[in-house]
Amino acid sequence: MRQGTFFCIDAHTCGNPVRLVAGGVPPLEGNTMSEKRQYFLEHYDWIRQALMFEPRGHSMMSGSVVLPPCSDNADASILFIETSGCLPMCGHGTIGTVTTAIENRLITPKEEGRLILDVPAGQIEVHYQTKGDKVTSVKIFNVPAYLAHQDVTVEIEGLGEITVDVAYGGNYYVIVDPQENYAGLEHYSPDEILMLSPKVRTAVSKAVECIHPNDPTVCGVSHVLWTGKPTQEGATARNAVFYGDKALDRSPCGTGTSARMAQWHAKGKLKSGEDFVHESIIGSLFNGRIEGITEVNGQTAILPSIEGWAQVYGHNTIWVDDEDPYAYGFEVK
């Protein structure tokens, strides 16, 4: 018996996948996207697993669901889905979703070139540019980002003692900068980063507590951001972001870029109004910028923006059938 039919549009943002679910997800209860996120996880998480996990997805698959706006001033809402769960915010996911939604007329903007979007982390503003029927760039004015914990020392098997920072940019990130026991991203293979990252995330999660002061459902360290020397002309810095159980972001990571700009600002390395060009593990670039300064629960925070591009590459209809023994997906760990 068929459990559900889902109409999807597949794209990638600077190399990282975005599967937009354009139809098939039932209405979600809740007044805010934070509430709708919790409702989805409690009642419809099988949809996420079926569409993100193998055999229909893979360990790096991520996606989104476009929903009606929660706020009167918003154009639409976005629910972010990926192998690890439903993120409060996703930068590359927003860029891919906006590109796909505008090109396929899934969202009708109140103002051409500008969207207000409700997301679980809050409300964001997005500007986009077009050439003909194509969206050529998307700029996100993200939620406030801040340095949550500084100089956290942990012992990591296979690495030794390292000192890290934890910053919020829509998700909580462990940021590992070059030091005595970590020479920099350029000295490690992707396989080595994948092996070390879960150990770092677990150790830091035990050492510090991360709960967003404005929404306690946004909690816990979810990503590990490894830094290194840039290789692309014009890049300020390079990173590799680990998420889920065994995924490395192919894009420069939007919320990670926001978190890293917050870290740099807190340490006096980046000022309001300055640009930050972030390079991914495959060499793709996001253009970041500190648009202003604000506060989160009395703590200094930045107002970050991230700009990038996405490419739509296909439409597909996915059936989830109860008679399929792998109807709800699987992970090989």
Swiss-Prot record:
Cited InterPro entries: Pro_racemase_fam
GO MF annotations in UniProt: 4-hydroxyproline epimerase activity
Phylogenetic placement of the source organism: Bacteria, Pseudomonadati, Pseudomonadota, Gammaproteobacteria, Vibrionales
Protein name: Uncharacterized protein VP1330
Source superkingdom: Bacteria
Family to which the UniProt record says this protein belongs: Belongs to the proline racemase family.
One Pfam family matching this protein: Pro_racemase
